[in-house]
Regions:
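Short beta-strand/loop segment that forms part of the nucleotide-sugar
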Residues: 39-48, 69-74, 99
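Glycine-rich, basic loop-to-helix element that forms the pyrophosphate-binding segment
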Residues: 73-89
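Conserved nucleotide-sugar donor-binding catalytic segment
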Residues: 144-228
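A conserved acidic beta->alpha catalytic loop
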Residues: 31, 46-55, 98
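Short aromatic/hydrophobic "clamp" motif used to bind/position activated sugar donors
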Residues: 94
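Catalytic core of nucleotide-sugar-dependent glycosyltransferases
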Residues: 207-215, 220-247, 270-287
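A conserved hydrophobic helix/loop-capping motif in glycosyltransferases and polysaccharide synthases
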Residues: 12-24, 28, 35-36, 45
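Conserved donor NDP-sugar-binding/catalytic core segment of glycosyltransferases
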Residues: 106-138
Length: 319
């Protein structure tokens, strides 16, 4: 009887929260189990799924034992789920993958090689949006942040999606894993806190992560909340790490933080996403993120919602 080679010791742990992802979770699991680099384990945290996800996960875990384990928690959200998975992770390198997304077969191998070849703590790659309602499906490779003003770039926008990076476990432990203080934007929060801890990042300029969209309602249902959470994350970073932003002129810093809120308010307004626009315009007034010229848009937003919508309609968007 032919002897099977012993599995490689675990070096990379992939943490995957799962909530009602039955149509997609098998593909997500298999993309991890099929990685070209050995020594990869998968920890899936079922976040109180009510569809067939749990049964699918247990069948897959049995097929891929001992490299895959399934944990369960009551519905708490993806960030508590990821923290639970981290507590059970055995690898010195950590990747995150949502249950409806996927990676190229060589993704973890190439990201790990980039970390091995440098002293970086984070390796990141390009990604592509796929599926119905995706806002553009052109593959995207982000810039080499190590050659830019990294603080400004990270404040401008979240630098990469949750599954487009591989991180040393020691760095994640040093910043305490994911914060659970906000409804959203806690992946962005993690990248900012990791940047404050270590500026050692390396880019792999290939598209190896794929983000699945599920139609136009994916973001818009809670867009205003995501914007306010992202603003809070930016402000918290600035307050906690003044040494990282001391080189930025005050006007530039304000444009990157408070200016983000007003930009998103106008974006929602001109897209006629008026529920979001009204909340964000009111928030801009409350937070002081406005100028005199903005008042012609902000003041109507203080009206009751039906009157605000009617006024915008009568003005053809020109409040």
């Amino acid at each position: 009887m032919e002897t099977q080679p012993a599995p490689l010791p675990t070096r990379i742990s992939v943490v995957m929260p799962c909530y009602n992802a039955a149509p997609y979770v098998r593909e997500a699991v298999e993309c991890v189990m099929g990685q070209t680099r050995g020594g990869v384990e998968l920890i899936v945290v079922d976040d109180g799924s009510t569809d067939a996800s749990r049964d699918i996960l247990h069948a897959l875990a049995a097929a891929h034992a001992p490299r895959m384990q399934v944990l369960h928690q009551d519905r708490k959200g993806p960030y508590p789920a990821r923290n639970l998975g981290l507590r059970h992770a055995g690898g010195s390198l950590i990747a995150f993958l949502d249950a409806d997304d996927y990676l190229s077969p060589d993704c973890l191998e190439k990201l790990a090689a980039a970390l091995d070849e440098t002293d970086a703590d984070i390796a990141y790659c390009g990604w592509q949006n796929v599926g119905e309602g995706a806002p553009g499906t052109t593959p995207y490779v982000p810039p080499d942040y190590a050659t830019l003003d990294t603080a400004a770039e990270f404040l401008r926008a979240c630098p990469w999606p949750i599954h487009a990076a591989l991180v040393r476990r020691a760095a994640i432990d040093a910043v305490g894993g994911f914060s659970e203080r906000c409804f959203s934007a806690m992946d962005y929060d993690l990248w900012l806190r990791l940047y404050a801890h270590t500026q050692k990042i390396v880019r792999v300029p290939e598209v190896m992560a794929f983000y699945r969209w599920h139609g136009g309602g994916q973001i818009s249902k809670t867009r205003w909340k995501q914007v306010l959470d992202a603003l809070r994350v930016r402000r918290d970073f600035v307050a906690a790490h003044p040494e990282r932003i001391a080189h930025l002129p005050a006007a530039r810093l304000a444009e990157l933080t408070d200016g983000y809120l007003l930009r998103e308010a106008y974006r929602a307004y001109w897209r006629r996403e008026l529920d979001d626009a009204q909340v964000l315009l009111r928030a801009a007034l409350r937070e002081g993120a406005w100028g005199v010229r903005d008042l012609k848009y902000i003041l109507p937003a203080l009206l009751p919602a039906p009157l605000f919508r009617r006024l915008v309609g009568l003005a053809g968007g020109q409040a």
